[in-house]
From Swiss-Prot:
Keywords: Membrane, Transmembrane, Transmembrane helix, Viral envelope protein, Virion. This is Protein F9 homolog. Belongs to the chordopoxvirinae L1 protein family. It comes from Orf virus (strain NZ2) (OV NZ-2). The chain crosses the membrane at residues 35-55. The keyword Cell division does not apply. Its main location: virion. The keyword Phosphoprotein does not apply. It is found in: Virion membrane.
Length: 73
């Protein structure tokens, strides 16, 4: 799951880096950014938030289980 998410993030990141210069040029001329770029940015932010929340939850569970053992010792 995490590996697939990382691969997807890497693909989106490479796609974004390829599209960003063109979109910057378009913005400089007063054009609106393409919807695909906006959707890609939204997808990256959503994936990032989900990944962070999952990591926090996993760390919380581990910490919760580890704490009583540490207190007993």
């Amino acid at each position: 799951g995490h590996a697939a998410a990382n691969c997807a993030l890497a693909r989106v990141a490479t796609a974004l880096t390829r599209r960003v210069p063109a979109s910057r040029h378009g913005l400089a001329e007063g054009g609106t950014p393409p919807w695909t770029l906006l959707l890609a940015v939204a997808a990256v932010t959503v994936l990032g938030v989900v990944a962070v929340s999952l990591l926090r939850r996993a760390l919380r569970v581990r910490y919760r289980f580890a704490r009583p053992a540490a207190l007993r010792a």
